Amino acid sequence: MEESITGLITSFGFSSPEAFIALLVVVLAVIGAVIVVITFRPLMEYYPYTYPNARVRAKIGKILNEKQIAELAESESLEEVQNFLRGHKDYAKFVDKYPIEQALDANLAESYDLLARIAPGDLKPTFDLMLDQWDIKNIKSVLIAREAKLNEEETRELLVPYGELKDDQDKLIEADSVQDLIVALEGTPYAKILEEALPDYNENKTLLTLESALDNYYYERLLVKSSSQADDNTRMLHSYIGTKVDIANIKIILRAKADNLTYDQIKPYVIDNGYQLRGWKLKEFMESEDMNSLLSSIESSEYGSIVADHIPEYNSTKSITVFDEALDSYERNMAKNIFRKKPFGVGPIVGFMNKKEIEIKNLKIIARSKRGSSIPSSEIKEMLL
């Protein structure tokens, strides 16, 4: 028996049974290594998300649900809304320190700050850049305050206590003009952005010229920064951010065409290059002769089905709100789909961002509705996202 096995082995070209056994061990080791790689590769992809997602899921659990938001819409006063928020730890420290809208912005900024601190390596540069939105928001608030001739205290109440410029807010508040603000921002990229937009502003005296220049700077960098193709997680985050930019552009152009604005009047307010809507397509949208022409152009784009389903309702009401709501719904559903597809990856992070932004927007709607003349709760609920 032993001789027959030896003969069989040598017939395959092996000099001895030992040589055959050695090769067999090597082959089994290689197969084992392949199995290990196949088994553990997904785990290695998701391992960096273990801690961030634990933190984020805990935060998602604290998001106010629809019932709580509806109850707040039915509250009798702004003070009642504030008292409710004082019962929630994440809001209490801000509600007791700032006016209500400033408190809500601070809570949202804190959420983004958390994401920037805990984001996995491939996502961290994108979330670090997202923190710039608070500097830009504050610069825009100072511009608006100067236009409205608000005093320093009123201006301070508009600012979010976050961002790289947090410690320089006093200098920004003291600026009496756009030129003064540029001087106060010297050494930051925002000084150059405003300086380049200043001639157009001096010509048309429209703050949107300066605000749009800041928005373009932020979103163009964000699209580039998030465009890493490291894995499915980075690609999905990029697609979500890119879609938000595209939706913002579509909304701007829809409003502009509803007001019969021309290409030259619209262009300064549109983010030059979107995600799926490249420059040439945006140009086509802006050059549309009227709303019907614009809707036809949008129908031929990646966002066509969203708009097409609501054209009959628009034709009936002549209100672009139907498109705004449809686009907002598309963005929400996209976040939910990413959550479902990547529950152990970027999904919870994207889901939290979307849910948190909606929560803050709804709370602002309710807070504004409780000021001054009373608005029926039924009308407030219709405004909620």
Curated annotation (Swiss-Prot):
Residue intervals passing through the bilayer: none
Major location (coarse): membrane
Biological process according to GO: proton motive force-driven plasma membrane ATP synthesis
Gene3D superfamilies for this protein: ATP synthase (C/AC39) subunit, domain 3, V-type ATP synthase subunit C domain
Subcellular location: Cell membrane
One GO CC annotation: plasma membrane
Sample GO molecular function, one term: ATP binding
Pfam families recorded: vATP-synt_AC39
Leader peptide range in chain numbering: none
Keywords, ordered alphabetically: ATP synthesis, Cell membrane, Hydrogen ion transport, Ion transport, Membrane, Transport
Keyword Cell membrane: yes
Membrane topology designation: Peripheral membrane protein
PANTHER family xrefs: V-TYPE ATP SYNTHASE SUBUNIT C
Quaternary structure (record): Has multiple subunits with at least A(3), B(3), C, D, E, F, H, I and proteolipid K(x).
HAMAP family: ATP_synth_C_arch (MF_00314)
Function of the molecule: Component of the A-type ATP synthase that produces ATP from ADP in the presence of a proton gradient across the membrane.
Family: Belongs to the V-ATPase V0D/AC39 subunit family.
Protein name as catalogued: A-type ATP synthase subunit C
Organism: Methanosphaera stadtmanae (strain ATCC 43021 / DSM 3091 / JCM 11832 / MCB-3)
Taxonomic lineage from the root: Archaea, Methanobacteriati, Methanobacteriota, Methanomada group, Methanobacteria
GN (gene name): atpC
